[in-house]
Swiss-Prot record:
Source organism (scientific name): Notamacropus eugenii (Tammar wallaby)
Tissue note: Mammary gland specific. Secreted in milk.
Source species, domain of life: Eukaryota
CDD domains cross-referenced by the UniProt entry: LYZ_LA
GO biological processes: defense response to Gram-negative bacterium; defense response to Gram-positive bacterium; lactose biosynthetic process
Protein name: Alpha-lactalbumin
Cleaved signal peptide residues: 1-19
One annotated GO molecular function: lysozyme activity
PANTHER family to which the protein is assigned, alphabetical: ALPHA-LACTALBUMIN (PTHR11407:SF32), LYSOZYME C (PTHR11407)
Residues bearing glycans: N63
InterPro entries for the chain: Glyco_hydro_22, Glyco_hydro_22_CS, Lactalbumin, Lysozyme-like_dom_sf
Length: 140
């Protein structure tokens, strides 16, 4: 009886928002709809996203003193804000928690800003390690 009650309470406590785990071609299509194919080759970007977040909208990683959020693993180190009062000082002008919802439009807009950096996709270390060569499996 106690374990049934525990499971019931756990079910109530879980957040209502479910993660979306995209498949590579779904992600590629959404990125194309938002013009990302004009910014960066989609196979490289989808490969990178897969290796940093598993293409999951609710991926959240503690990385030393920083925290990274969402499908693009956007860092709270200047790109987004942990607290509402810090939003205006962040590059993307958004709360980091917004990168954990199922609407990735704001994630994409922030990623476009990151891609304007001189290192481009190199901002994400997984790109250089996994997504430079042999990208056939990431094409749709």
């Amino acid at each position: 009886m106690m374990s049934l009650l525990s499971l019931l309470l756990l079910g109530i406590a879980l957040p209502a928002t479910q993660a979306i785990d995209y498949r590579k071609c779904q992600a590629s299509q959404i990125l194309k709809e938002h013009g990302m194919d004009k910014v960066i080759p989609l196979p490289e970007l989808v490969c990178t996203m897969f290796h940093i977040s598993g293409l999951s909208t609710q991926a959240e990683v503690n990385n030393h003193s920083n925290k990274e959020y969402g499908i693009f693993q956007i860092s709270n180190n200047g790109w987004c804000a942990e607290k509402q009062e810090d939003v205006a000082n962040s590059v993307c002008g958004i709360l980091c928690s917004k990168f954990l919802d199922d609407d990735i439009t704001d994630d994409i807009e922030c990623a476009k800003k990151i891609l304007q950096l001189p290192e481009g996709l190199g901002y994400w270390k997984a790109h250089e390690t996994f997504c430079i060569e042999d990208l056939d499996q990431w094409r749709c």
